Amino acid sequence: MMHILVSNDDGYQAPGILALAEALSEMARVTVVAPERDRSGASNSLTLDYPLRVHGTGPHRYRVEGTPTDCVHLAITGLLSEEPDMVVSGINAGANMGDDVLYSGTVAAATEGRFLGLPAIAISLNAFEPRHLATAARVAQLIVQRLSRDPLPSDTILNINVPDLPWHEVQGWEATRLGRRHRAEPVVRDEDPRGRAIYWIGPPGSEEDAGPGTDFYAVRNGYVSVTPIQVDLTRYTALDQVAGWVSGLGRPAEEGH
């Protein structure tokens, strides 16, 4: 039977990860290794300056005093006696579309699985207070079934965003690219009880590139967005221009001391 590692960034008690683990347990052996608290926005950060503590919360269930990336790294490289066959991260409360993927701990957990050589999926539901986790859980089951039967190229991470709708209202599936947001809103300044300035990170920018073909457009129109992403961030279309730009910087070895 397939063995799936489940993680997230909302914490081990979040409704989304509980729904995901339950759904995938119907088709695979599931091990959950997740942060002990909400680590949304942790991105791909690894904890390097202090040891990680792990606490068992039930059979094949662990909470980690660390980031989502810590959880997956720890699970695959030392915690588990048997390496899983796949990593599934989610179900996140709130979409991870466009630029969101650079900050998302949900996507980061999947990315770490891909770094370590495993098929990886990140699943998010387009609502901060989800009403239809069952829809996203069913999406997870179908995607896992399909991926196990028909693997994708080894450098591919699937970023799945699901509209917060009853299953019978979902319009279908769309392969999409990442959209883009406008610049983030300003930070919010406040004061602590002693009158010292404190700051809250402001909300993300509104949708900018959100037309047909994007993840934003698909979810807005009731479709499940399936975006293949990868770790390589190189902008290949700019390489020739940058090569010419760099050539104008000179050659230090020919300039002497």
Curated annotation (Swiss-Prot):
Lineage: Bacteria, Pseudomonadati, Pseudomonadota, Gammaproteobacteria, Chromatiales
HAMAP family the record matches: SurE
Cofactors named for this entry: a divalent metal cation
UniProt GO cellular component terms: cytoplasm
Catalysed reaction, written as an equation: a ribonucleoside 5'-phosphate + H2O = a ribonucleoside + phosphate
Organism superkingdom: Bacteria
Protein name according to UniProt: 5'-nucleotidase SurE
NCBIfam families: PRK00346.1-3 (NF001489), PRK00346.1-4 (NF001490), surE (TIGR00087)
Cited PANTHER family: 5'-NUCLEOTIDASE SURE, 5'_3'-NUCLEOTIDASE SURE
Record flagged with keyword DNA repair: no
Task of the protein: Nucleotidase that shows phosphatase activity on nucleoside 5'-monophosphates.
Top-tier EC class: hydrolase
